[in-house]
Structure formats: C-alpha cells, structure tokens
C-alpha cells in the first residue's frame, strides 16, 4: 500500500498525522500538488509537484494509484476514480469513500454544484475540528492495520 495525498487542499494538521503514520509504519507517502509542499526528511515521505491547471494533480494521482493504495482527498470525483481502480479513498474528515457510498456522494456533490450555479449560496464545510482529526486518525490506523 502507498498513500497518495491530494495536497493542494489537505489541511496541515492532517498532513502532520500522515507524516507520523508514514514514519511509524514505513509506508510510502507522496503529497501531490501544483505548488511546492514542505515534507520532513524521511525515506518514506516525498512530494511531487505537478504543473498548475484544473485537475492536474488529481489526474496524476489517478495515473499513479494502484489497487490497494490509499488516497487522501476531499474531492469526490477523484475519490470515485480511485475506487474504480481498486484503491481506497479517505477524506480529511475521516470519511471512508466506498463502492457502496460513492454514488450517493457524487449525486450530492452534483446537486450542490447545481444550487451554487443557480445563485444559491450553500457555504462551505465547517472548519476541521478535533472530532474530525480524531476520526481521520482512527480510520487511517484501521486501513494501515489491514495492509
């Protein structure tokens, strides 16, 4: 198992949890972004900078991910592509996307996009809180234990 991170939108506190997990377990962790990302010196952790552009980082993750790999992303369409390739997708809030729930999440995302396009302000998600961080760490530990 390798861990791929959609790093352009990944909160710093989640990155720190991932850094510690990679050091502890020795699993390969790659942060993919269209800007430079600082990573601690480690043989298990690296960053991959891609060119700027719409979905460039997402497309690079999809190109590189293999069955059984884990992708950290809040991007629902990216999560769907990862699942289709046999990977696991986990949001920074600790929500595990699966074959069983990704369709409903894609539908909700599309519905919210339609609302925003029609001028209805739906607001963004609330700030990441301690409960979210704990849910992420717990789900990450469960996935790493299964590898």
UniProtKB/Swiss-Prot annotation:
PANTHER family: UPF0178 PROTEIN YAII. Belongs to the UPF0178 family. The lineage of its organism: Bacteria, Pseudomonadati, Pseudomonadota, Gammaproteobacteria, Chromatiales. This is UPF0178 protein Tgr7_2584. It comes from the Bacteria. Transmembrane segments: none annotated. InterPro entries: UPF0178.
